[in-house]
Amino acid sequence: MKKVTAMLFSMAVGLNAVSMAAKAKASEEQETDVLLIGGGIMSATLGTYLRELEPEWSMTMVERLEGVAQESSNGWNNAGTGHSALMELNYTPQNADGSISIEKAVAINEAFQISRQFWAHQVERGVLRTPRSFINTVPHMSFVWGEDNVNFLRARYAALQQSSLFRGMRYSEDHAQIKEWAPLVMEGRDPQQKVAATRTEMGTDVNYGEITRQLIASLQKKSNFSLQLSSEVRALKRNDDNTWTVTVADLKNGTAQNIRAKFVFIGAGGAALKLLQESGIPEAKDYAGFPVGGQFLVSENPDVVNHHLAKVYGKASVGAPPMSVPHIDTRVLDGKRVVLFGPFATFSTKFLKNGSLWDLMSSTTTSNVMPMMHVGLDNFDLVKYLVSQVMLSEEDRFEALKEYYPQAKKEDWRLWQAGQRVQIIKRDAEKGGVLRLGTEVVSDQQGTIAALLGASPGASTAAPIMLDLLEKVFGDRVSSPQWQATLKAIVPSYGRKLNGDVAATERELQYTSEVLGLKYDKPQAADSTPKPQLKPQPVQKEVADIAL
């Protein structure tokens, strides 16, 4: 009995010693120049910029999952579109006088050119390898039916011809021509149906997860970069010297450590809002978030996949958010082609696919509850749309698919749950609160912490978004000759607009196409066909947009 007691006592002492050692380790404070919260494409892109701009800065990246690029950046959790407004009709709204506004489309395209240049530069440096593993040429098409929609697309095409960024786009109302471009879309369709399509050969499909993994793998080669997986941020506290102490829990062994950082970037996707609120900076009080998920129908049947090589976007129906437009897309995932159709909106209170059902509730505060209520009251059509989407049956989704693929067979398709997108709700002096489409960099006045909120266009514009962040929080350094020279080496068009400069546009497109292994055909002169005039449109209540 005495031996057993002694043995148990020894075990208890040993376990206590292990516990004390773990606590001692947790109390140790790690120091870093830059803390990147989240292992997605935004953190990876910012880290890559800073590695070139300030190679001596130490960086630490923390990710709560067991690997990087497993949430929104994962190729299966997003549509993989290189958003450049070549086919997305929501970026070219029709004005009340019938004219087409192209300002937003031009801005989106300019932004994607920055991303292409950033990726091409990383390929040349050996940071990104084998471009075909993450970006591939997939033509971008818009496709509509019905007289009003055909008239709209014709006018859109004519309006975009005024921009050097959209040269090379083709337009057709001929069934045979459109069938040649997208056989699945036309086979089995009523030959009398009035249809129209535009096609741009230089469209792209992008695997943002693969880009993220390669960027982070390159960062890991440096001794002053640390990646901590299965690590969740539990607290952020500003210190008297304007550094930050961030408490990070190890989800595998239950220990915690403090990281003292001079600059903190919150690039945690849907979790960014809650962490921004945790920081306590006053700028966070203006924001709330509302989660919307997305589902896609997926086909891997070779008879389907090999018969379709395009991303084909339609036009949102009346009363639906413009960004909700259905599309049938060629994707290249895990090294093989598949076809996706969707998205269909879903609802969950989670802010991340791997998040908590308490995310929405825990992010609601006395500061943002009223803006959220105002958005709900002012956007009944949006609420009605989301409810109708959640109620869709398997048959409803299949009927939606048949509008774009008339000869589709149910057995060729399965349903896939993609990622969560947290929509920005921002306090507004006039309306109380507004739903904001897009992404927004929120930072403190001192430039010591910044977060990226929002969802669209998201990953495809990671490079320009992180440029905006650098200018916002490192303004003095950005204006220095050293940083200016480095940024212009990374992004040759930095500080200039390509739109309107045909020679510069062609030069950058040719350069990035060659480096990234993408198709490039020098476009013909802009179409000089007289611009069609649309009839003035009756003013309709605007439906708030969301990202799926």
Swiss-Prot record:
Keywords: FAD, Flavoprotein, Oxidoreductase, Tricarboxylic acid cycle. It is an enzyme of class 1 (oxidoreductase). The gene is mqo. It holds the Pfam family Mqo. This is Probable malate:quinone oxidoreductase. The keyword Ubl conjugation does not apply. GO terms for molecular function: 2-hydroxyglutarate dehydrogenase activity; L-malate dehydrogenase (quinone) activity. It catalyses: (S)-malate + a quinone = a quinol + oxaloacetate. It comes from Escherichia coli (strain 55989 / EAEC). Residues 530-541 have a biased composition (Low complexity). Belongs to the MQO family. Its EC number is 1.1.5.4. It comes from the Bacteria. Its cofactor is FAD. One of its GO terms (biological process) is tricarboxylic acid cycle. SUPFAM superfamilies: FAD/NAD(P)-binding domain. Residues 521-548 are annotated as: Disordered. Pathway: Carbohydrate metabolism; tricarboxylic acid cycle; oxaloacetate from (S)-malate (quinone route): step 1/1.
